[in-house]
Structure formats: structure tokens, C-alpha cells
Amino acid sequence: MQITYSKSSDSLVLSPEKASKQKSFESFINKFKSTLETAFHQDNDIDQLSIQRGLPKEVLAKIMSAHPMSLCIPKEYGGRGGTVQENLTLLSAASYESLALSLTIGINSALFLQPVAKYGQENVKMPIFKRFIEEQNMGGLMITEPNYGSDALNMQTSYVEEPDYYHIRGTKHWAGLTGQADFWVLTARKQTLNGNLQRDVDLFVCDNSAPFQKIVVDEYFENLGLYQIPYGRNILDVKIPKLQRLEPKTTGVQMLLDLLHRSRMQFPGIGLGFIKRMLDEAITHTQQRYVGGKNLFSYDQVQEQLSSLQSNYTVCSALCTKSSELADIHNDLMPLGFEANIIKTVSSDLMQKSAQTLLQLVGAIGYKLNHIAGRGIVDSRPFQIFEGANDILYAQISESLIKFMKNVKEINVWEFLKDHPLAQRAVEYLKELLNFNLDYQMPQRKLVELGKAVSRIVSMDLVLKMGENGFRKDLIDGTVSMLHQEISNLMTTFSFKQNTTVVENYEADSSWANLATS
């Protein structure tokens, strides 16, 4: 598969109203891109900024002067009331320049502003949104605790209800924008009279500048990547007014899942801009770098690597399309864990894979924090860990598949997927790989392997659907070929029976030196 250059697509005929809205957004996004160009390339050198902890205040103020946070604030509160498509486009524009900046915007939008817009009490929305628009405030979300990361629903942060406020106590860590955000959505469980904690989780808005709501940063972490985002350990002993409790439609856990699934569906927006940057850097480098009398671009192995980057770009584009279809703030995403987990895992895996590919192509010069290739490795890696570690989510994808199959009393994978709306196009290419009966009692490692394969099958289906809707055909064809190969490899791994376990006290009788001869 040869590397393919992108061309501008034919413009669609829009209604006057849609054309006006599109022009308005184009003006907004172009201003944002221009602001990033000034902040990162004219006034400063982003490669040097990226090796420092945090962004200088003047740089952040310059970026925020373009009002990126206004996009997901509803119009009735002074914001732009942007669509999911527009929000993903904003995240992509930011991640092309800085993954940390894009994540900062994503934290603010998906983990604070959207939950407040959807679940916040009416009397507190306007003051909060006004401060975001006029004072460039920021917000984040605190869930994770020491010993309660993947097991977050058993969090120990608790609250008691008093006549005028909720008293929240606990410890939270690894919340992005620690010590920097002005507002936080806090998660806690209600403490009963006997001291036990209820199973449900409640969410509260904490105004870090208000009396009795100050969160104490106990320690700042030396995070490996994403230098511009502060992380740390936070001590909570705050009193939150009654009006600042988020109001669930059903339960707090379901509200939290709606929030997290919507956030996971924003990952491809962050991923697309980042992957495009990796692709563009790789093409430029390989065209300019000569080895053995010809440029790297002309070597077959390099073409394969560049084509894989282009495939990643195409898959992430398809995931953006699906997210824009599903993730509107008015939709309840709680039941869509299958879709959200696939979108999150695939996009984050492709981000890390793309960074690794670029570094391999660039070579030693890229193994530096002040080079986009090396920085891309450490900045993209945590996306596979936070908001659900990918191996756990892959297992959940398989568990969802098994549940779906049980519901219709089907044990053959191909027979089930050929009628599934998220797989029916792709499985026509894959019958020889999927025509088998599934053992519902498979070990956890096999759940993870199958989940990876299913996520790529759904990705192929989304790519094919995007092709039907007019996306560039040569990119579609190349990506389908790449995905077919990957799915074949994943299914081979899945079919291999292997249950090796760790050998404890392995050092006994395992020294090679004792076996060596002089």
C-alpha cells in the first residue's frame, strides 16, 4: 500500500442557515488556530515550553483569549452552544500543536462544563459559565483515590448532609489541573448514621475560591509526560452549598457513567489531530532524509509504516464520525458502554502506536522531550490508562458481546455479527476468521484478546460506512486492508490456547551463569 496524500473534498450544498453557522464556526476555529500559531511558534518555541512544568501564565492567557471553552457552554448562558462535531474539531486543532492543551480543553468540556450544563441546578449555572467566559476560569473532575483507581465506585471519599451544605472529606489524586482549576466536580458517597457508605455516588460542584471550599494540594506529582498539566494528591475537607449538588435523572452512578462515556467519546477528537501531526512529521522527515542515495520515503518498509499512520488517521476519523452521531449532551450515554469503550480504546491505542512509529522513523534525534516524536510517546501513553485502563475496557467489550449473544441465544460469532449494526459491513470480509462458536466461560486474558479484535471489527465497519458516505476511497481501501491484517493477527492470538501463569520464587535454579562453561 503506497502512501496517499490528502486532497480537499468537494463541498456540500448547505442551507443558508447551516452555511451561516458553518461560516461562524470556521471563523472561530481559524482564530483559535491563529492564536496557537502565535502563542506556540511566533511568541514562543513550543518545543522549549514543552520541557517545562506548566504553561506560563501569559501563554495560557493568550490561548484562552480565543475563548475555546465557550464552545460547549450553552447559548442561553453566553456560550456558543457548539455541536459534538465542532467540539471534536476544536480538540483536534489543539492536539495537532499540543496534546496537553487538547487534554486541558477536554477536561474542561467533557468532565466539567458538560456535566454542569446537563445536571447542574439552574441557579448556579449562569455564575459558573460567566466566570469561564469573562475570567477564563477552568474546571476539572476528581474521582480517583489512592487504592481506588479502577475500583473507583468503592471510593472512600464521603459526605454528610447538613441543613445548608454537604460536608465532604477524603483524598483524591491524579486529577488533571490539580492546583490550577478554579472549579471541580467532586465525587463522594453518602455516609450513613452508622458510619457506612452508601453504594451510590453523588457529584458536587466545588468553587475553589469560595469560603470553606478550598481544596488543599498535599503533593504535586512529577508526571512522566503531559508536563503542561499539573497532577497531584488533594485533601478534601470542604462544605458545599446545597445548590451545588448535581442532580441525576436516575442514580448517581448512572449520571457518572453518562459523563464518562461522553468523555470517552471525545478521545478520537484529541487523537485525530495528534495522529495527523505524527503523520505529517513522518512524511516530511522521510522525504527529506536520504540513506543509501535515496530518501527514506522510497523504501518499502517505510511506505508500510507511513501507510499504517495513514490508516490510523482514517480509523480515528471514522471514530469521530461515530462520536458526533452519538454523544450529543441531550443523549443518555449510560447504556452505550460498548460503543464508548471501543471508541476510547482504539483511539488511544492508535495515538501511542502512531507516536512509536514516528519515533522509529525519525531515529535518535527524536528521543528527546523537546522533539515532537519523543514527547509524543510519553504524552500519549496515559490515554491508554486513565478513564478506564484499556485492558479492562477490552474485557468489558467482550463481556458486552457475550451478553448481547446470550440475549438472542446465538453462540456463533459470525452469525451474530452479520446482523449487528456496528459490524455487518465488516464481517463480510471476515467470515473465515469469525465463523466459530464462542465459549462464554473464557479466561480473562481471552476476554481482553477478543475485545481487541471486536474493537477493530467495529472500527472496520465504521471506516466502510464512512466510505459509503463519500470519504476518500483510496484511504478507505488501504485502511480496510490494514485492519483486515490486524484482525487476522488478533484472532490468531485469540485462538491459541495458552494459560501460562507466573512462577513464584523464580530465582531458584534459574541462573544462567551456573550453567555456563568456561
Feature map (PLM): residue ranges:
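Glycine-rich phosphate/cofactor-binding loops in nucleotide/flavin-utilizing enzymes
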Residues: Q2-T4, D10, A364-E432, Y440-P443, ...
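A short core secondary-structure module
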Residues: T171-I215
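Amphipathic, small/basic residue-rich leader segments at the start of a protein or domain
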Residues: M1-I107, P127-E134, K431-V458, L462-S518
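Glycine-rich beta->alpha junctions and the first turn(s) of the following alpha-helix
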Residues: F221-N312, R381-F386, N390, E399, ...
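N-terminal glycine-rich flavin-associated loop
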Residues: L103-N123, G149-A152, Q287
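FAD-binding glycine-rich core of flavoenzymes that anchor FAD
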Residues: V116-P146, E161-Y166
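C-terminal helix-coil-helix/basic helical segment that borders enzyme active sites and/or dimer interfaces
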Residues: D47-Q48, Y313-V346, L359-Q360
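Short Gly/Pro-enriched turn/cap motifs at secondary-structure boundaries
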Residues: N147-G149, A175-G176, N223-I229
